[in-house]
Amino acid sequence: MEPEIKIVNVVVSTQIGTDIDLEYAADILDNAEYEPEQFPGLVCRLSDPKVALLIFRSGKLNCTGAKSKEDAEIAIKKIIKELKDAGMDIIDNPEVNVQNMVATADLGIEPNLDDISTLEGTEYEPEQFPGLVYRLSDPKVVVLIFGSGKVVITGLKKKDDAYLALDKILSTLKELEEEYY
């Protein structure tokens, strides 16, 4: 049975304009914080969808915490509308690029991390971190595997890559099982 994959974080970026007046934007946006001595961007938190948006003077905007690219796009559209309504020169429909997705899943088994740690591309130091770090080259992702069978997959650009990564891991575990047992 295929493990259920849950996307827990999507980070996207876009360009909403140039030379954004962050002081003015902080005044007009609800839930916005701008403290340039601590961070060079404006931080705006939305509750629906629940995301954080980082807006920089250059016009670059990052959205983090979304559960899907669509949620991130909805959040970006909300911010763009507020900024445009306040008279700011903002790009209407900017191209939104996924920078990273994080997914979780349960393998449904309790893998032997010591056995897996013999594979190329793995790091396992249980005294420092309870999970095994497995770097795959295709898809180019990092998978954290825990003794409970839970996995965290980072570096995704699309959800399909999470399924590819899990398929590779499950077939590798099957091969290891045949080799060791």
UniProtKB/Swiss-Prot annotation:
User: sequence repeats: which residues?
Assistant: 7-83, 98-173
Among the GO molecular function terms of this UniProt record, one is: DNA binding
Please provide the Gene Ontology terms (biological process) for this protein.
DNA-templated transcription initiation
- Family (UniProt): Belongs to the TBP family.
Protein name (Swiss-Prot/TrEMBL): TATA-box-binding protein
Write out the entry's keywords from A to Z: DNA-binding, Repeat, Transcription, Transcription regulation
> Which HAMAP family would you find in this protein's record?
TATA_bind_prot_arch
InterPro entries this protein is in?
TBP, TBP_archaea, TBP_CS, TBP_dom_sf
**S-S bonds:** none
Tagged with keyword Protein biosynthesis: no
Gene from which the chain derives: tbp
Q: What is the stated purpose of this protein? A: General factor that plays a role in the activation of archaeal genes transcribed by RNA polymerase. Binds specifically to the TATA box promoter element which lies close to the position of transcription initiation.
For whether the record's keyword set contains Plastid, the answer is: no
